[in-house]
Amino acid sequence: MRRATNGRTVRTVVVDVAGAQRSGLIDVLRQDGDIVVVGQSGDAADAIAQVAQTRPDVVIVDLHLPGSQSQHAIEQIMARTPTPILILSGRLDDRQSPSAVQALVAGALEALPRPLHWTPELAAELRRTVRLISTVHVIRHPRGGLLKGSRRDAALGAGKAPVVAIAASTGGPSALATILAGLAGLQAPVLVVQHLHTDFVDGLVDWMSRVSALPVETASSSQTARPGRIYVAPGGTHLRLGGNLRLELDEFPVSVHRPSADELFSSVADSAGAAGIGVLLTGMGDDGARGLLAIRRRGGVTLAQDEASSAVFGMPKAAERLGAVTEMLPLDKLAPGIHRAVRQVQS
């Protein structure tokens, strides 16, 4: 049954293999009277042309197209006709999960696991996500390759013990690629929160390990954060900094987001004080704004990604409005800004 419309049409192109799979997906979308499928294709070149011709509000891309067609379609759409892209991935294994992360780096806004059967709950989540990202103004992604970095461990520096906390949401993986590749030799632990469906977090960590200039791992409860290493919040779990650089994890629903940027930043403010360095990247909503303000009030350095380089300026803008941002920087200046902040803490 199609539900009543609210007057705002979301024009959508579906890029998926032909047959029952694509038909089922389109049927699920059409249950929302406001979502209109204006194009469909199982071929990358044809999909790229359809998007350029129809100028949809959202493109849905399944990652199971033959060869590397899905990735190629995403890269070319974002380079030629920037459009909010939702990717669907089936059963996640060691091959598929990194593909989802690469798609996010290429410019896709969101990723959802594709179920074998669309339950009412999963169908509602799909339609809700389509409507949400349809409102996002996306930026052009002219490059398709992953950034490379040379991995090296950093020695513990003299002076205070700085701690870097980075948080991102929509558009975050691409921004993280740029930043992490520029952190070679950083003499501080780096704690990362990325809003992402739980099923994709392991793939994110694996991919980050390949593009980062520093070793990357999933954070574990009670481990000590070491300088020159990057710790990523597990899926569906808050990451906090405790005393003596001890990491704390919990799944208590204290925020709409789990992991939460506010939870991470607030804990860094409490535990590191003026040695805390907060970095807020692209994303929808306002998660992280209050936590970043807490770091600044304790004397720490707070950086945020500027509007021009953000896929979505919501989170940095919310922090700026609160007066939480020490310095607003373009993406390519954030890694140097982090190095500078660490040296400032240690001086």
Predicted regions and their residues:
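Conserved acid/base catalytic micro-environments in cytosolic active-site loops
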Residues: M1-V36, Q40-S347
